[in-house]
Amino acid sequence: MQEHRIIFNGDWGTMFWAPKLWQPEGGPYSARALHNFVDLLAEHRVDTFAISPNTQLAWYPSKAVPTALDEYTRGDQRWAKWFRSCPPETNIAMMDRYLDLLEADVDWMAETVLACKQRQIAPWASVRAPPPEKCATGA
């Protein structure tokens, strides 16, 4: 009998909310944290990782579309309450982890794809879009 496929679906923040799990040694967030996350998926026999790297803005490095980090600076208090279920310091720390990678010239999506391929996990991107009634018709 063929084994079941295991698909893990994660959004843009999946690897950024729990740094003590993915980078227990601390320090600026690094590509190693992304690899540690994918290692855990592989250990649990996940064979496909679908990640959504966007909301209304791209949460990945882009020169073509606006990104969540375009005007972000470390500790930017404008982001303190953006995710209301978390305390302000958690929101700021999560954004700073993205900035750590950006400053180290790490494209987290590309690095995650590399980690997936190294662990024989199929990397997929899932894209969120507004419902059709919210889109302009362009007519």
Task: Indicate where each model-derived feature is located.
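Catalytic domains of carbohydrate-active enzymes, especially glycoside hydrolases
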Residues: R32-W59, Q77-R78
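Boundary/entry segment of secreted carbohydrate-active catalytic domains
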Residues: M1-G27
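Aromatic- and acidic-residue-enriched carbohydrate-binding clefts of CAZyme catalytic domains
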Residues: L57-V106, T137-A139
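Structural recognition of the beta-strand scaffold that forms the well-ordered cores
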Residues: I6-N9, D47-S52, P123-S126
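Active-site beta-loop-alpha junctions enriched in small/polar residues
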Residues: D11-G13, N54-Q56, R128-P132
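Surface-exposed amphipathic alpha-helices with a cationic face
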Residues: M1-Q2, A110-W124, R128
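Well-ordered, non-membrane alpha-helical segments in soluble/globular domains
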Residues: E25-F37, E103-M109
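Substrate-binding/active-site clefts of carbohydrate-active enzymes
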Residues: A125-A139
